[in-house]
Each structure stands twice: as C-alpha cells, then as structure tokens.
Amino acid sequence: MNKALRQKKIRELVENNDVSGQQELLGMLEKEGFSVAQPTLSRDFAEMGIVRNRTADGGYRLSVPEEPQEDILRGLVGMEVLSITANETSIIINTLPGRAHGVGSFLDRINSPEILGTIAGDDTVLVIPATIRKISSVKSYIQKILSQP
C-alpha cells in the first residue's frame, strides 16, 4: 500500500466526517479497502499533525491542520540550504547545522518520481535519484523547488 495514498485517504475521511478516534477511522479505512495497523495509523497521525479535539457536546473529533502554504514552506526550507552539488551518481545538499533532516523530509514529502529517497545527517542531505541518467535534471529540479541558484 502506498503511504501517500493512505495518508490522502485519511485526510479526506477526517475532513469530511465526524471521526471520534483511531478505532472509528480504522473501520472507515477498512471499508474503503485500506488494511492499516493501529501503530501505522498512529505514525500517520503524528506525521500529518492530526489531533483529537473536544467538541461542544463533550465528545471528541479528529482534525487535520491546514496544509501549510507551499510557497512559504519552500522559502523557509530554501533558506536552510547552503549549496547543492552533484556527481555522476548522487546529489549532495549542504544545509545549516541541524537542518538537514528538515530539508530531507521536505524533499521526501514532495513524492517526486525523480527522487528515490534521501538520507539526512546533521548538515548534509544525500539525495538518491531514481536514475543516474537524469542527475542534472534532478539537481535542477531541486534547485528550482528550493529557489537555489
């Protein structure tokens, strides 16, 4: 099962229904054809920022925070990037100290088919392209989305 597709369905169900908790949502996901374990759902909640709020009638309702404005988020992440370099097989992004994880997470959440994955240290992100034949275009794509020269 695709994580992005599952999280999209979770967002849709929580936004369009009065869902009181994880067990209720697990049942709704099952009816939609998604078999999800409770620990996986808990991790999705943490990643997506889903919280359980008390309603006026004393019950509970899950809520999803608004999506951050993409341009603002890109600008903030872009300010953390010091340089982007590449060789024949990979792309390296140097960041401010302690900010590599945030930059790597941002790139992972874009779900670009051009990026196989990222590995982040303290101030360096290793970007693994889906194919080494497109290193130059992937580097340009990353520079564009992070507003880097």
Curated annotation (Swiss-Prot):
Domain of life, source organism: Bacteria
InterPro entries for the chain: Arg_repress, Arg_repress_C, Arg_repress_C_sf, Arg_repress_DNA-bd, WH-like_DNA-bd_sf, WH_DNA-bd_sf
Matches recorded under Pfam families: Arg_repressor (PF01316), Arg_repressor_C (PF02863)
Record's keyword annotation contains Cytoplasm: yes
Cysteines paired by S-S bonds: none
Recorded metabolic or biological pathway in which this protein acts: Amino-acid biosynthesis; L-arginine biosynthesis [regulation]
Keyword Cytoplasm found: yes
Keyword entries, A-Z: Amino-acid biosynthesis, Arginine biosynthesis, Cytoplasm, DNA-binding, Repressor, Transcription, Transcription regulation
GO BP of this protein: L-arginine biosynthetic process; protein complex oligomerization; regulation of arginine biosynthetic process
GO molecular function, one term: DNA binding
GO cellular component terms given for this protein: cytoplasm
Subcellular location: Cytoplasm
Annotated PANTHER family: ARGININE REPRESSOR (PTHR34471:SF1)
Summary of the function given for this chain in its UniProt record: Regulates arginine biosynthesis genes.
Family classification: Belongs to the ArgR family.
Identification of the protein by name: Arginine repressor
Gene name, Swiss-Prot/TrEMBL: argR
